[in-house]
Amino acid sequence: MIEAEKATYTIKRMCELLEVSRSGYYKWRRARESGPSPTKARRAELDAKVAVFHKASDGVYGAPRILADLRAGGERVSRKTVAASLRRQGLAGISPRRFAPATTIGDLDAVVPKDLVGRRFDTGALNRVWTSDITYLRTAEGWLYLCAVRDGCSRRVIGWAIDEYMHTDLVEAALAMAVAMRGELAERVILHADRGCQYTSAQLARFASEHNLVRSVGRTAVCWDNAQAESFWAALKVEFYDRYLWPTKAAAKLAVGDWIERVYNRRRRHSAIAMMSPVNFEDRLTQTAQAA
């Protein structure tokens, strides 16, 4: 208002009428003419970048993973600063809930393998321990069952299969994908799972023997003995699957496969592997081995 009427009234008179100080008015005008301060400009720039990375993660990433994205782009910033930016913008990441053990149907007549892992899923090398499990996926057309196989070192999903029935063929299909991806295995690989009848079956025992896999299972009703596989389900359900409604089984199958390969394996940063994606982590391991 003062700016609009300064040709008619003196600045002093208008400040008196509006009950504002002249020093305050001149301070405001200098700030407007000089533009935002370097601090405010830097904050606005950071907020924009944080918002872009948050959106790119489908609203999943919080401060730790966005910090990794920023630093990968050359930004020198702290986790505390990133967290403050998220708060200013009303943004938040999604943290997986504590996982709950999935229902396991055991076979009382099966010969149960020993636990060869002892919760040490990551031995520091690829193709030493594979973990596997089965989970339920709800759709409007009924249930689907997803079996996944992950490398214990890189956390990469190397095999997966989805079907309407939870039988041994489902597990075998996921393992067949893993074997095809990894190629001929020079050493025996431990395949660790729970005591579900699919994993203790004679059918799977034959498949494992034919493909240089040695079976290992955890204790009954102790979900921590297969914690790495269970943590994958928590990420899948909380960060992706449970955020949407699935009208058809076909749509769910396509979307889950896309999320596993495009997001989880190639984009999602994992705190356990230096905030890298599983594929990038495997690439680094390969480069390190070749340089040695």
Language-model regions: role of each:
Residues M1-A292:
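Charged DNA-binding/catalytic regions of mobile-element recombinases
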